[in-house]
From Swiss-Prot:
Stretches for region Interaction with m3G-cap structure: 128-130
N-acetylmethionine: modified positions: 1
Species of origin: Rattus norvegicus
Region listing for Necessary for interaction with XPO1, in residue ranges: 1-160
Protein name: Snurportin-1
Domain IBB: 11-73
Subcellular location: Nucleus; Cytoplasm
UniProt similarity note: Belongs to the snurportin family.
Gene that produces this protein: Snupn
A molecular function GO annotation: RNA cap binding
Chain positions covered by the region annotation Disordered: 1-39, 69-89, 315-358
Bias (Polar residues) ranges: 7-22, 30-39, 349-358
Residue span of region Necessary for binding to the m3G-cap structure: 210-329
One Pfam family it belongs to: Snurportin1
Length: 358
């Protein structure tokens, strides 16, 4: 999957990834340059075909994540790692390999699918930090997108505490967005439930399963001693114009960050994929051509017209910034947690320092 994505990548990219959500949408009204968006629909088609024939061993993959047991992995990988460490004179701590890049990430929704209303589902996402949740052997671990374990705690997820972890097979792996304000892990997707992997299942089935099983776990949505963080499933909606208008006029129990558009047939594939699209709510009208109701979600922020210029300027010093952050992290044990999208500006729109990578 990764090789195919790289082979099909076009020249547009302010970051290293094609249509990365770390950069602004190429079709913001103030910047209607003709970027290469035709490939996005073609890459969607090819990825859907590829996943029909490509069946990875996700049973063992999920087990390794749950048990942190990598026995049997290629010995050459370890030798390569050892050689790299011997050649590396930089004392900065390397990123962990095992739990990094395990989440399925989106691209900006540039090329609007012709079957958007029939074959796509939209999820309203809260402001927060993406987290890989692994509940296994009586403990629950939270990992960043980069693979750092930032918290371990008990939870009422299957396998997440000593009381309900009856067997080693009772493990759960979730894709979540953590809201520090609400002390809540909003469940975006499910990769494994009670030892049963769902990587090869279609999005509509994964969402159905997730929203059916989460309410069955009594107390999971409450903050208690044994469950110090709430786990709440995010709802999904059809992508018809009528549904989108209704969604954008709703009130949500969290601050809304943006919208994720999932193709119904998408399997859960770690890494960026054009089969998951990302838009900020105020972009729906311009990008999708849908008449939206006036309201807080659809009001364009002041920085919308300056976002592209800010990102470009910010990227010039990105490598230096990353080196400083990594060095600082290795010294004090704190690591940069990556946002789902561009955080709100805390300074005037013309300041390039106010934007961070997602």
């Amino acid at each position: 999957m990764e090789e195919l994505s790289q082979a099909l990548a076009s020249s547009f990219s302010v970051s290293q990834e094609l249509n990365s959500t770390a950069a602004p949408h190429p079709r913001l009204s103030q910047y209607k340059s003709k970027y290469s968006s035709l490939e996005q629909s073609e890459r969607r088609r090819q990825l859907l075909e590829l996943q029909k024939s490509k069946r990875l061993d996700y049973v063992n993959h999920a087990r390794r994540l749950a048990e942190d047991d990598w026995t049997g992995m290629e010995s050459g990988e370890e030798e390569k790692k050892k050689d790299e460490e011997e050649m590396d004179l930089d004392p900065v701590k390397k990123l962990p390999k095992r739990y990094a890049n395990q989440l399925m990430l989106s691209e900006w929704l540039i090329d609007v699918p012709s079957d958007l209303g029939q074959e796509w589902i939209v999820v309203v996402c809260p402001v927060g930090k993406r987290a890989l949740i692994v509940a296994s052997r009586g403990s629950t671990s939270a990992y960043t997108k980069s693979g750092y374990c930032v918290n371990r705690f008990s939870s009422l997820l299957p396998g997440g505490n000593r009381r309900n972890s009856t067997t080693a097979k009772d493990y759960t792996i979730l894709d979540c967005i953590y809201s520090e304000v609400n002390q809540t892990y909003y469940v975006l997707d499910v990769m494994c439930w009670r030892g049963h992997p769902f990587y090869d299942c279609q999005t509509d089935f994964r969402f159905y399963w997730m929203n059916s099983k989460l309410p069955e776990e009594e107390g999971l949505g409450e903050k208690t001693k044994i469950n110090p963080f709430k786990f709440v499933g995010l709802k999904n909606f059809p992508c018809t114009p009528e549904s989108l208008c209704k969604v954008l006029s709703m009130d949500f129990p969290f601050e809304v960050d943006g919208l994720l558009f999932y193709h119904k047939q998408t399997h859960y594939s770690p890494g960026s994929t054009p089969l998951v699209g990302w838009l900020r709510p105020y972009m729906v009208s311009d990008i999708l051509g849908v008449a939206v109701p006036a309201g807080p979600l659809t009001t364009k922020p002041e920085y919308a017209g300056h976002q592209l210029q800010q990102i470009i300027e910010h990227k010039r010093s990105q490598e230096d910034t990353k080196e400083k952050l990594t060095h600082k992290a290795s010294e004090n044990g704190h690591y940069e947690l990556e946002h789902l999208s561009t955080p709100k500006l805390r300074s005037p729109p013309h300041s390039s320092e106010s934007l961070m990578d997602s």
